[in-house]
Design a protein with these regions (language model features):
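Active-site neighborhoods and metal-handling regions in enzymes and metal-associated proteins
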Residues: 1-364
């Protein structure tokens, strides 16, 4: 559980970064869960709020649907938003601050224009603050790690139950629904994302959502799934064999497994995302499958299922201590099958801790 001290620590760190960037105030907004930053800064999990952070003001503003929820969840001062102040509440909250930090990546053009109109563009300077908060979110606290571990536990236990349910003749949709239901039954808020479930040729589509296709004997199934617990995500992929795989399937599987193990083994705060990605990519390329591994090796994980830092050729920065990242190499042969294996790991410094201890040695459906 996220405690008051966690929120106070996050805000204290953010204020230091704001001072260094000469930002007077930050406005963090969520509308229909467009951003997880308000959750990070206030612990409020509802779908609409303005969170205002300045040296002399830390408050959360929302409408009557969420007043009691905010009182229960957040240590920040509640500012009530209603019909009487809707037209001027933002101007009141931001009055006196010159440089306003806002989330450029999740703010639509229309919302930004509306913000400038309500606050008064002539009196303020608007600067993107996304990276300030993203950098804070990369390194997880002990409490955050415990929540992620619980999300992993729920997902893993549910997956083990799923293995006994997968049989030829059942549909992809049926099996994905079983997995998602089981995760919620075991305590998840909800799935971290819509489950990816691709059997046979559908597994060659990296983000293939389940269809009414029936599972067949002799197929591989790529299952990418996760549970969300108290706002924090898990993200796991396993490739399951239904019956006996062919020699080609075994070769591809073993190649992906080796790429996964070797890149996971070296992941640490002394290496960049690019360097870790290269280890897995070189193994797959040397095996002759380089053209069939098109995505990055991994990504950060936390309140969002995809967040910083990236584990790919695009990220030349070293991974920060405290980050949780995925390691997920894959090979996808169009019209045949796909293989992906994904673990979540915690960067503890010069080493890491694997948070997803599920065997991936020739997982077989209905044989567990």
């Amino acid at each position: 559980m996220v405690l008051k001290k966690d929120i106070e620590r996050r805000i204290s760190e953010l204020l230091k970064k704001m001072k260094a960037e000469s930002i007077d105030v930050i406005l963090s907004t969520t509308f229909e869960n467009s951003s997880r930053n308000p959750k990070y800064l206030s612990n409020f999990s509802g779908s609409f709020a303005y969170v205002v952070i300045a040296p002399d003001k830390q408050c959360i503003c929302s409408d009557s649907r969420y007043w009691e929820q905010i009182k229960d969840q957040s240590p920040l001062e509640l500012v009530k938003y209603d019909r009487s102040n809707a037209s001027h509440i933002l101007k009141d909250l931001l009055n006196g601050y010159k440089r306003i930090g806002f989330e450029a990546k999740t703010t639509t053009i229309s919302a930004f224009n509306d913000l400038k109109e309500k606050v008064g563009a002539d009196n303020h300077e608007f600067v993107a603050c996304d990276e300030l908060i993203n950098r804070l979110r990369m390194s997880k606290s002990t409490d955050e790690i415990e929540l992620i571990k619980k999300a992993e536990e729920i997902a893993i236990e549910s997956f083990v139950e799923l293995l006994n349910e997968i049989k030829p003749g059942k549909t992809e949709k049926e099996m994905a629904a079983f997995l998602e239901y089981t995760m919620v039954k075991k305590g998840a808020d909800k799935p971290s994302f819509d489950t990816i479930f691709g059997s046979g040729p559908n597994g060659a589509l990296p983000h293939m959502f389940p269809t009414m296709k029936k599972i067949q004997e002799g197929e591989f199934i790529v299952i990418d799934f996760g549970a969300k617990y108290q706002g924090y995500c898990s993200d796991i992929t396993r490739t399951v064999a239904v019956g006996e795989p062919t020699d080609e399937m075994k070769t591809v599987y073993e190649t992906v497994k080796r790429a996964q193990i070797e890149s996971e083994k070296i992941a640490s705060s002394s290496l960049s995302g690019k360097e870790i990605d290269k280890v897995a990519r070189d193994i797959i390329t040397e095996a002759g499958y380089g053209d069939y591994f098109g995505h990055g090796l991994g990504h950060g994980l936390g309140l969002d299922v995809h967040e910083q830092p990236g584990v790919s050729a695009m990220n030349e920065d070293k991974l920060p201590q405290g980050a949780v990242v995925t390691i997920e190499p894959g090979i996808y042969l169009p019209g045949k099958f796909g293989v992906r294996i994904e673990d979540d790991i915690y960067i503890t410094g010069e080493t890491n801790e694997v948070l997803t201890p599920v065997s991936y040695t020739h997982l077989r459906a209905h044989e567990t």
